[in-house]
Amino acid sequence: MKTPFARRAGRALAVLALVGASTAAAQLTPAAAATPALQSIVPVPASVTPAAGVTFPLVSTTKIVTEAGSAPAKDVGTYLAGVLRPSTGFALPVSDAPASVPADSIALLLSGAPASVGTQGYQLVSTASSVTVRAQTADGLFAGVQTLRQMLPGRVESPTAQAGPWSIPGATIVDYPRFGYRGAMLDVARHFHPVSTVKRFIDELAQYKINNLHLHLADDQGWRIQIDSWPRLTTYGGSTQVGGGAGGYYTKAQYTDIVNYAASRHITVIPEIDMPGHVNAALASYAELNCNGVAPALRTDTAVGYSSLCISKDITYTFIADVLRELAALTPGPYIHIGGDEASSTSAADYLTFVNKVLPLVAATGKSVVGWHDIAKATLPASATPQFWGTSTSDSGVSTAVSRGSKVILSPANKAYLDMKYNSSTPIGLSWAGYIEVQDAYGWNPGAYLSGVGEAAVRGVESPLWSETVVTPSDIDYLAFPRLAAHAELGWSPWSTHDWTAFRTRLGAQAPRWVAQGINFYRSSQVSWDTGGTTQPGTCADPEWSASQVYTSGNVVSHNGHKWTAKWWTQGEEPGTTGEWGVWTDNGAC
């Protein structure tokens, strides 16, 4: 967590704080008419030219053909088939494309794309007889496939067979990203999240063209990655988490599994080992890393700024070199993140010494450095990337680094932090950087946000999710969605397309997709959520839930087309927004 002072984050307190609170979340409400598919794509494409009256029917005989002889293109085709088969029930065989695109096919080709799409963009042309996605790389094909998914009804994301028909509107789309780097961060140190949860998050990122996953692997509360040369980091340092749970860690095989799974979704994993602060789990594991030679106790609170590696000891840099070497060997991507934030227990002089010693250790692994923008207090090489997490719109260190050739990742805490609450009644999350509603998450320009950091100096945008209060996949969903989609659009779409009114319409059209995927998203009152023809709220026989009403154990209400039973006394806690920690039991659709 990036915060100037310590904060408590017990789950029980988060739940109790709901008592007497009101909610600003909205119900799923039917749009006046279903949003046309070409007006519901997130991120919005750079250019869309509709073909009036034309649709491509996806039917049982439809096939997927891919660039002949290209394994990466075939992998994208296999991925697309895997998305569409469960809901449609169609076979959708994948094979090499012949010389000309056959009728009744979806073609994924690595030839014929306009030069303007670059290495990550694509061209998509849908006609009455075929859909053709062209790109220069498999990354571009994969991006085009994500757009293709959103041209189909949201129920296509269901894991079970759904009724058709399935049609794709006729159009020509030419699309490419504003920034090459579009990322999200998951903190697996404060609360450990198993491989299955990380993979689920990867799938959620991929559909919005996010191409980098930053994993926060070590902090005061736990060390989460196996390091053979320092085994107690995980066997001891990985045994705790916030609140005193059992913690956990990834073996090298599990981490490799995550990296490979992300790569199959065209996402690069960026591992972070935060230092010289946020290191209590390491200090507790090895006494020799402490200046006084005494290992502190493991900690499960959420205080920050109290721990530091011993800057003057040679063994500190042996330790760091070993960790970086083993981590780099597991990580095919170009970056390693060294943290560098909130090092309050490290003197200013020692901090500069530390950064200057660690930079060449990273370079020795063949990787480039990313660090929280605090590292820009040192003189950085042009290859280093400071990640801005502050709440201001200027930073002298960052602007100096840019003047020397560095590019910046933007994650301003009051705009991009997914762990910030939406409002005062949000049941989980923090608020030190302020509340971030959907419009706040969308309403800033990364290319003109930081003084001295113009568009060309921005590597991209990243959405960090710190996990002091985040325990379950449902918690991840609730804080990430819908804000992650807003950040994805900021990173992908040209600024000329930026329009809140249009975006909130397209965002509302995502609801049927998220419902089909089982994503527990926050139903912001700022957005008119389209139910896509599913059961509407208010059709249940039981009384509709009210934020102002007091409920006690056994009370039954209806909300969002489901029937809910209260477990205990409550007022203001919206059914379906707090997962396993909530007061309401979901009895299913009415």
Predicted regions and their residues:
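Conserved, mostly hydrophobic/aromatic
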Residues: 64, 137, 184, 205, ...
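Hydrophobic faces of well-ordered beta-strands that scaffold small-molecule active sites
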Residues: 182-186, 213-215, 269-273, 336-338, ...
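Active-site neighborhood of glycoside hydrolase catalytic domains
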Residues: 282, 286-406
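Contiguous, structured surface segment used for ligand recognition
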Residues: 34-179, 475, 491-502, 508-517, ...
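Feature activates predominantly on carbohydrate-active enzymes
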Residues: 117-306, 315-317, 325-328, 332-335
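Tryptophan-rich substrate-binding surfaces of secreted polymer-degrading and adhesive proteins
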Residues: 530-590
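Flexible, acidic glycine-rich loops studded with aromatic residues
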Residues: 89, 381, 390-537
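Secretory targeting and sorting signals
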Residues: 1-34
